[in-house]
Amino acid sequence: MVAAAASSAFFSFPTPGTSPKPGKFGNWPSSLSIPFNPKSNHNGGIQVKANASAHPKANGSAVSLKAGSLETQEDTSSPSPPPRTFISQLPDWSMLVSAITTVFVAAEKQWTMLDRKSKRPDVLVEPFVQDGVSFRQSFSIRSYEIGVDRTASIETLMNIFQETSLNHCKSLGLLNDGFGRTPEMCKRDLIWVVTKMQIEVNRYPTWGDTIEVTTWVSESGKNGMSRDWLISDCHSGEILIRATSVWAMMNQKTRRLSKIPDEVRQEIVPYFVDSAPVIEDDRKLHKLDVKTGDSIRNGLTPRWNDFDVNQHVNNVKYIAWLLKSVPTEVFETQELCGLTLEYRRECRRDSVLESVTAMDPSKEGDRSLYQHLLRLENGADIALGRTEWRPKNAGATGAVSTGKTSNGNSVS
């Protein structure tokens, strides 16, 4: 009805007494037109013309009305197209609306994904620039990264240090096809190996905490590089952990230490920071006598997944081996708050190691000291270490003692 009304609005009404004119196709119009003169009321005459569209065929015959009589004739001509009206000439709005809806749904989905990704606490955040060389990244402590105390393990922290180091190199464009290797290092088959690691723990992050790691590099002697890390609580800004390390270059084929070539030095020196290490502990490590060790763990061997892409045992594994010989009662009553580790020799695939631990008689307040030795069964030293331990919860002012994570979530 709406279409008929809209169509009739485009046709003029005849004046009174006007007879119908022949249609477009002579005396055989394609529509049925019935003019009539209704009765006029006292207000004046009103002329009305009714137009009713009819199908051009009825049982195969054309139908028309001429001079008050109904005549039929077999349709021998081709069928005429349906009349063009205002409605029939409108575009198909349903297709346009469908296309617009599809575009908006896709855009909304993409925006939702980007918005969700930006709110994840463990993704790579935009690195801040401090003299163009510092790097910052956030992490969320997950359930499989904690121990029985709901705190992150020392291995978790070491893995975080390694991850931020590689991402720092990547952000500077120094990461080539190797594991932390620059283009010039790859040409000369050189890799980085850590020679010393020091860690100080004020408080361990707990399950659900979001931490922020800041790292930078500086020069260490003529043929070394040092890297420092600071771990802070994203919620309070409290410095939780400090760590510093010294690195040297080793030839991947000969497995011997190497000087830093001038070409490599030109790649890395522009990103060095002129600053002192965050930990300055010059105390020397004493070599243990295996016979006087308090605890020994034998038969330690590297597994296939202990090696990195440079075919080098990951430095995190050395710390795990070192702690294998620490008595269980130490872990039950104390927590590790300080670590110094010096790497002396590389561990090979077929190496068999033993871990030795001895308690140091000297004490620093309520802290206990332990000396460590990691060596091959043939007697060659792999690493020397010293650890400091304090009573549990002595340094905990966060989730363990308050019952809440840095995000305000309960850990009970």
Swiss-Prot record:
- Show the coiled coil region(s): none
Report the subcellular localization: Plastid, Chloroplast
**EC number in record:** 3.1.2.-
Record bears the keyword Transit peptide? yes
Report the function annotation for this chain.
Plays an essential role in chain termination during de novo fatty acid synthesis. Possesses thioesterase activity for medium chain acyl-ACPs. Main substrate is 14:0.
Q: Where is the active site?
A: 310, 312, 347
Which UniProt keywords are present, listed alphabetically? Chloroplast, Fatty acid biosynthesis, Fatty acid metabolism, Hydrolase, Lipid biosynthesis, Lipid metabolism, Plastid, Transit peptide
Q: Please tell me whether the keyword Lipid biosynthesis is annotated for this protein.
A: yes
Q: Which organism is it from?
A: Cuphea viscosissima (Blue waxweed)
Q: Name one GO molecular function term.
A: acyl carrier activity
Primary residence: plastid
> Where does the transit peptide start and end?
1-50
Name the Pfam families on file. Acyl-ACP_TE (PF01643), Acyl-ACP_TE_C (PF20791), Acyl-thio_N (PF12590)
Q: Where is this region: Disordered?
A: 1-63, 393-412
| Family affiliation | Belongs to the acyl-ACP thioesterase family.
What reaction is this protein's catalytic activity? Answer: tetradecanoyl-[ACP] + H2O = tetradecanoate + holo-[ACP] + H(+)
Spell out the protein name for this chain.
Acyl-[acyl-carrier-protein] hydrolase FATB3, chloroplastic
| Gene3D superfamilies assigned to the protein according to its UniProt record, in alphabetical order | Hotdog Thioesterase (3.10.129.10)
Q: Which GO terms describe its cellular component?
A: chloroplast
Q: Where is the composition biased (Low complexity)?
A: 1-25
Q: Where is the composition biased (Polar residues)?
A: 28-44, 399-412
